[in-house]
Amino acid sequence: MSAPIIAIDAMGGDFGPRNIVQASLACLTATPSLHLVLVGQASLIEELIARHGAVDRSRLRVVNANEAIAMDERPSQALRGKPDSSMRVALELVASGQAQACVSAGNTGALMALSRFVLKTLPGIDRPAMIAAIPTRSGHCQMLDLGANVDCSAEALYQFAVMGSVLAETLGVKKPRVALLNVGTEDIKGNQQVKLAAGLLQAAQGLNYIGYIEGDGLYRGEADVVVCDGFVGNVLLKSSEGLASMIAARIDTLFNRNLLSRAVGALALPLLKRLQTDLAPARHNGASLLGLQGIVVKSHGSASVSGFQSAIQRAIVESRENLPQRLKGRLELLLQNGQT
């Protein structure tokens, strides 16, 4: 595939374009084949670019957008009332073929609504789902939905499982193990929609469905793809990130109590740094909206520079793998087998 072109919503997120522009320039330096389009208030973006010195402008373009979507803005207002928002213009670049992917740290609800409107969903998919990598004991698993769909039918959960399995395959996992997140592993556990989804998955051909999984099983690495509704997934994701930050803070406090603990900490520092890097939320930042006729990656609104770089890197990988087309081909077969 030709060099990836990624459209960046430069005005999204809690910090506006400051971190986003810095992360974008760092990615350009790290990936010589990458091309970026920064979308937003052009004068402000150009000012931020100028502060960072020499930049290869042959691989960087700035597209002006006169409006920005607030983090607390209603999706309906973003959809109908702001046709020239940075988020919408970035998505339209993907729809028109001028970019292969869009990355935004903006309002999640607005991004979902605009993505569905501008890019449309793949055949057979009712609603896109948000998926991201969750660190586990043995590596990581792909988990969806992470907040795009608070209430989900059994059919939606089935579609999420199919999409998650296909994504895991594109990332090199052979016969990915697919599980439904539940309050227990027994057949009688779970709400009605989870039980109905389990029946659909058990009957599906071409899916390696292994049954229910509990939260602790997720972290033990017992599945490659874990499926749940967006309410449960978002709570689990935020709790995981908070737990990782708390553990890092407690370790730091423990090793700085006195001279002896600082000496022990100095000896353990290389291992602790490695653990901190492996579990850092910034490393795993970037959730994909699966099920669209285009690539969209959602970054945390509060992402650091390195965190937003991770989101851009995820978009690069999916662009190089031509993920929407790969999804489309596999979805046609799996959805037909599962719902005929």
From Swiss-Prot:
The chemistry this enzyme catalyses reads: a fatty acyl-[ACP] + phosphate = an acyl phosphate + holo-[ACP]
Tell me where it resides.
Cytoplasm
EC number(s) reported in the record: 2.3.1.274
| Pathway noted in the entry | Lipid metabolism; phospholipid metabolism
Keywords annotated in UniProt: Cytoplasm, Lipid biosynthesis, Lipid metabolism, Phospholipid biosynthesis, Phospholipid metabolism, Transferase
InterPro entries noted in UniProt? FA_synthesis, Phospholipid_synth_PlsX-like
Q: Name one GO cellular component term.
A: cytoplasm
TM stretches of this protein: none
Q: Name one GO biological process term.
A: phospholipid biosynthetic process
Gene Ontology MF term list: phosphate:acyl-[acyl carrier protein] acyltransferase activity
Pfam families to which the protein is assigned, alphabetical: FA_synthesis
Q: How does it assemble?
A: Homodimer. Probably interacts with PlsY.
The UniProt family comment states: Belongs to the PlsX family.
Function according to Swiss-Prot or TrEMBL: Catalyzes the reversible formation of acyl-phosphate (acyl-PO(4)) from acyl-[acyl-carrier-protein] (acyl-ACP). This enzyme utilizes acyl-ACP as fatty acyl donor, but not acyl-CoA.
Q: What is this protein called?
A: Phosphate acyltransferase
Q: Point out the gene that encodes the protein.
A: plsX
